[in-house]
């Protein structure tokens, strides 16, 4: 472990490999490149301190470097103990980001490093799962007066923050970047859809075609996972608690059933709910020999490991990122990535082109907080639509796509109530 005054990483000598990764993905992130050039010129964050808790891999590194290019003092810690890429954080440390993260860090180190990232006394927090914002409210309340606001990347985090707002304990404004069109329509659906299966296939090296895939949760992440499973040739079964989403899944052409029925026939199970104990003892007891489980939600609580451990007579690791639970009756159940985010633990996370849009929103959310914090109340906000549209237009331009514009006549027609049948 290499630790200095402003960093704690596995090995600083890995930085060159980290730079190669960052350079590679930056070539496929034209929107964030555009914003970085803008930030380098205008320095909107001069004198501003930004602390981030994110999955510290190559795309998030480019976001942090973009904020630093805008004049910010930047610190960072991991939002998941297993998603850190050690070479990338070494590169960040060499670049002057105050970074504290080691792949495989303990729970104690996880929070110790988060505290270190908060020691810069941030004005803005960028969160992924709301752990840092929660920690500030619980244990670092002396920082609250200096915090202008924060932003949140994930569905899970937004749920937690809305609960804080509802309970009257949220002390500063937070931008729910996750709830922006350019986030959930693309990152949650196409990003999670592709990267989840990337993680499953890297971890197992097994065929998806012909298998029964059970997708637990049919939000935007679940939609993407189900869509890509069908594209890979699987029979897809959706498990839902929301009758509207369940009906939508059926109309989209997927089978829909409850978890107990799905447990009997599933070959691969993917959770994407943001909730606890979605697959538990009563379901493990029904699964066929060789069933594989993976989680695409933020926390490792959706597939309930304590029940698996109680049922198992033997636990082993036949492959990296695969845990085998042998049950009393001889059945073997497999859990990928220790029940954590399979796309980030067993693979490299979402494609760069997707995170280009999400992190462009994060960069602009930070700028929005800096410019408007005096007018914002301690509640959860959504980014203004014009920022969504700006990101979409830059992305389209980078793809060589020119869209139609409304004529003045069309605008007037849409604004009028007088024209009828």
From Swiss-Prot:
Q: Where is the signal peptide?
A: none
Q: Which residues bind NAD(+)?
A: 154-156, 188, 217-222, 240, 296-298, 343
Per its UniProt record, what InterPro entries does this chain match? Answer: Adenosylhomocyst_ase-like_sf, Adenosylhomocysteinase-like, Ado_hCys_hydrolase_NAD-bd, NAD(P)-bd_dom_sf, S-Ado-L-homoCys_hydrolase_CS
Cofactor dependence is on: NAD(+)
Gene3D superfamilies hit by this protein = Adenosylhomocysteinase-like, NAD(P)-binding Rossmann-like Domain
Identify the metabolic or biological route this protein is part of: Amino-acid biosynthesis; L-homocysteine biosynthesis; L-homocysteine from S-adenosyl-L-homocysteine: step 1/1
Reaction catalyzed = S-adenosyl-L-homocysteine + H2O = L-homocysteine + adenosine
Concerning Pfam families, the annotation shows: AdoHcyase, AdoHcyase_NAD
Q: Which domain of life is it from?
A: Archaea
Main EC class the enzyme belongs to: hydrolase
A cellular component annotation (GO) from this entry: cytosol
Amino-acid positions noted as binding substrate in the UniProt annotation, renumbered to this chain: 128, 153, 183, 187
Database matches in SUPFAM superfamilies: Formate/glycerate dehydrogenase catalytic domain-like, NAD(P)-binding Rossmann-fold domains
Extract one GO molecular function annotation from the record.
adenosylhomocysteinase activity
Q: State the compartments where it is located.
A: Cytoplasm
* The record's free-text note on cofactor binding: Binds 1 NAD(+) per subunit.
EC no. given is 3.13.2.1
Q: Does the keyword Transferase belong to this entry?
A: no
Q: What keywords tag this UniProt record?
A: Cytoplasm, Hydrolase, NAD, One-carbon metabolism
Q: Which GO terms describe its biological process?
A: L-homocysteine biosynthetic process; one-carbon metabolic process; S-adenosylmethionine cycle
Instruction: Indicate whether Metal-binding appears among the record's keywords.
Output: no
Q: Which CDD domains match?
A: SAHH
Any idea what job this protein has? May play a key role in the regulation of the intracellular concentration of adenosylhomocysteine.
Family statement: Belongs to the adenosylhomocysteinase family.
Q: What is this protein called?
A: Adenosylhomocysteinase
Record the organism.
Pyrococcus horikoshii (strain ATCC 700860 / DSM 12428 / JCM 9974 / NBRC 100139 / OT-3)
Q: What is the lineage of its organism?
A: Archaea, Methanobacteriati, Methanobacteriota, Thermococci, Thermococcales
